[in-house]
Amino acid sequence: RNRSGSVLEVGVGTGLSLPDYKRELEIVGIDLSTEMLEKARQRVTELGLTNVKGLYEMDAGELEFPDHSFDTVVAMYVMTVVPDPEKVMRELSRVTKPGGEVVLVNHFSQEEGVRGWVERRMAPFAELIGWRPIFDHSRVMVCDDLKLVERKSVRPFGIFTMMRFQKLAEAKRIAAE
């Protein structure tokens, strides 16, 4: 995408995606894992990623940033592993600037078909490792000030979905209420 400005990556992990961002973007990453963040810092240093402005240990449900801090907020493979995805979604919206975007990549469960059957059978095993295979997309549709503008299947095998939301400007949000 032709994004510009500042990006918050929630659940940055070891920083595997950091080299993929355009160098013009200012990147901040957060994760709960100190060990993962250390690996991300090493990656930033080794690759000379001067556009990465900070990597912080932080809870996605209690972001320590002021309102409207970022042009884009990205959360890849995060929503099914956090204890309160609705709270996290509200926090992502809060720190996104009006007119900015929230981008999620996540697994969302399938109601029907072979995939739905497999997901229901695998759920008890997946939950043992902290993953929710039965996760409806409605759990991220909780913010009145976020408008879904794109939804599509992504690799591998189309089992993940990218959802792109636009943060409504204050005037638009009030008019929509």
Model-derived regions, located:
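C-terminal lobe and adjacent flexible extensions of AdoMet/dcAdoMet transferase-like proteins
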Residues: 162-177
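A short glycine-rich, Lys/Arg-flanked "PGG" loop and its adjoining helix->strand segment in the class I
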Residues: 86-98
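Short glycine-centered segments of the SAM/dcSAM-binding site in methyltransferase folds
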Residues: 6, 26, 99-101
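A short acidic, Gly/Pro-enriched loop at the edge of an enzyme's catalytic core
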Residues: 58-73
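C-terminal alpha-helical "lid/dimerization" subdomain adjacent to the S-adenosyl-L-methionine
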Residues: 103-161
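Class I SAM-dependent methyltransferase SAM/SAH-binding core
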Residues: 8-62
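A short SAM/SAH-binding and catalytic strip from SAM-dependent methyltransferases
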Residues: 72-84
